[in-house]
């Protein structure tokens, strides 16, 4: 039902008020909701590892894949939003039941004669320096799905207001979501840096800037398209989120050139985490010791900078989050251990590799948690409050700590149920094990993540222009969200099925 033009202006104000002046929820509750994703990954992995449920990939397999990796996450922010622990318990019960069911025995491949085996092994491509690990696909795919769900769900009354973006001070699920989007982009961005190091090359600053601008341009164009669309259609806006003209695509678009500049600083401080902390601390000091905080929160909007001050200055916090993500990527993407050719050492090599990665990830998780504690605790720390609006130091540390713990949880599922992936000796075997250990739905979201996110924004706008979301009941809300995510997932899986990659 279209909204009558005579009430459009007052309805627009209602929608703006609906997402304004919110104070968020507790960090512990947000952690419980976020925990649904790795628990879902556990259920999926037990089904696959014990029962080979998704091999071959049938329509039933797709339905269960969708229900787990999309449906459960949708439930966590709607019908089960007040009981995330119960949802986690129910999912863990399913995982335990499936695990206890006798394992499905797969038919073994016929043994090849010795001469055929030697020919086969000689033609196999050896492993490279980097690896596409299943837990990274699961982590990033789940993050993209939750983000897509929330950007539409927030406009309905069924979505709890404590999960929507906070006005100034506090924490919320959507505040974590936007930070996680940037953090995960940083993880992925470490891949070309690692390739350069492996090849012993170091691209000059001018080359890095040219490459970064090529990545930035499409995002900046999308930012301008969104700006013109919002203004032209008189769409409801939340000005204190980014400013009058700024939007998230501009933040994403300006990240690559600044990251390229910061890469030069590695000669002085050879750590992305160190650079992230340095930037975050300097920015926080400026907020606390100058009039910058007051300017961002209460200054008049009388020129282009002041109109977009939230977007401009929060960019430095998001840059710090991106660098923290890049540091994590430098840890989890490479193959840090050399592999032995002999079969007797394969298991040892894989075991040592898993243990080493586990200890490093756990260590960094503790570091980020400790830093967040000292930044925010009133008794033992600095007593600072989280602000996504300014993307201050506590916000950056909260995002880094939460994502580090989430990655660790996804990795534990990976290492426990698909350990053979870490013992693969050639590209073909590793690819087969990777496909076995990852959901087709999550792989599809990963492949065209930014394009699907853009499509989700378009669908969100379409729904808001045609449906009075504030007047929709619980059942209808769930129906709309399921249809919306069903369409998005169908597009993502369809693109993947036809081997289409959209680079933005």
UniProtKB/Swiss-Prot annotation:
One of its GO terms (molecular function) is glucosaminyl-phosphatidylinositol O-acyltransferase activity. Its EC number is 2.3.-.-. Glycans are attached at residues 21, 346, 499. InterPro entries: PIGW/GWT1. It is found in: Endoplasmic reticulum membrane. Pathway: Glycolipid biosynthesis; glycosylphosphatidylinositol-anchor biosynthesis. GO terms for biological process: GPI anchor biosynthetic process. GO terms for cellular component: endoplasmic reticulum membrane. Belongs to the PIGW family. This is GPI-anchored wall transfer protein 1.
């Amino acid at each position: 039902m279209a909204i009558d033009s005579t009430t459009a202006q007052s309805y627009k104000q209602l929608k703006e008020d609906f997402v304004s002046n919110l104070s968020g929820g507790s960090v512990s509750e947000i952690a419980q909701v976020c925990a649904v994703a790795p628990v879902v990954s556990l259920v999926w992995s037990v089904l696959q590892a014990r029962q080979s449920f998704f091999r071959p990939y049938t329509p039933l397999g797709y339905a269960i894949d969708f229900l787990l990796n999309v449906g459960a996450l949708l439930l966590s922010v709607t019908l089960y939003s007040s009981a995330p622990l119960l949802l986690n318990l129910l999912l863990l019960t399913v995982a335990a039941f499936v695990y206890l069911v006798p394992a499905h025995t797969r038919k073994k491949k016929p043994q090849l004669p010795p001469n055929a085996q030697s020919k086969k092994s000689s033609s196999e491509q050896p492993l490279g320096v980097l690896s596409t690990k299943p837990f990274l696909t699961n982590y990033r795919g789940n993050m993209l799905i939750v983000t897509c769900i929330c950007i539409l769900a927030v406009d309905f009354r069924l979505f709890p207001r404590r999960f929507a973006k906070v006005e100034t001070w506090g924490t919320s699920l959507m505040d974590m979501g936007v930070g996680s989007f940037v953090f995960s982009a940083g993880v992925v961005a470490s891949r070309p840096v690692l390739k350069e190091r492996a090849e012993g090359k170091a691209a000059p600053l001018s080359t890095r800037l040219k490459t970064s601008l090529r990545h930035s341009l499409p995002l900046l164009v999308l930012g301008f398209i969104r700006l013109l669309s919002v203004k032209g259609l008189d769409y409801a806006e939340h000005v204190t989120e980014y400013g009058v003209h700024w939007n998230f695509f501009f933040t994403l678009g300006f990240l690559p050139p600044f990251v390229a500049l910061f890469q030069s600083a590695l000669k002085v401080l050879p750590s992305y985490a160190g650079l992230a902390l340095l930037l975050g601390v300097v920015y926080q000091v400026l907020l606390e010791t100058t009039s910058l905080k007051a300017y961002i929160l209460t200054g008049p909007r009388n020129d282009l900078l002041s109109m977009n001050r939230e977007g401009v200055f929060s960019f430095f916090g998001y840059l710090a989050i991106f660098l923290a993500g890049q540091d994590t990527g430098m840890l989890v993407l490479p193959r840090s251990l050399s592999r032995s050719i002999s079969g007797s050492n394969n298991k040892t090599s894989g075991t040592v590799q898993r243990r080493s990665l586990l200890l490093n990830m756990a260590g960094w998780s503790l570091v980020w948690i400790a830093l967040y504690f000292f930044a925010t605790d009133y008794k033992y720390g600095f007593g600072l409050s989280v602000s996504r609006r300014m993307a201050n130091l506590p916000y950056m540390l909260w995002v880094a700590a939460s994502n580090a713990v989430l990655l660790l949880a996804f990795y534990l599922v990976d290492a426990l149920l698909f350990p053979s992936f870490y013992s693969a000796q050639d590209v073909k075997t590793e690819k087969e094990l990777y496909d076995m250990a990852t959901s087709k739905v999550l792989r599809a979201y990963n492949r065209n993540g930014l394009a699907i996110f853009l499509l989700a924004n378009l669908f969100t706008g379409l729904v808001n222009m045609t449906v009075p979301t504030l007047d929709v009941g619980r059942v209808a809300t769930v129906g709309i969200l399921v249809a919306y995510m069903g369409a998005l997932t169908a597009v993502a899986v369809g693109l993947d099925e036809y081997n289409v990659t959209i680079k933005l």
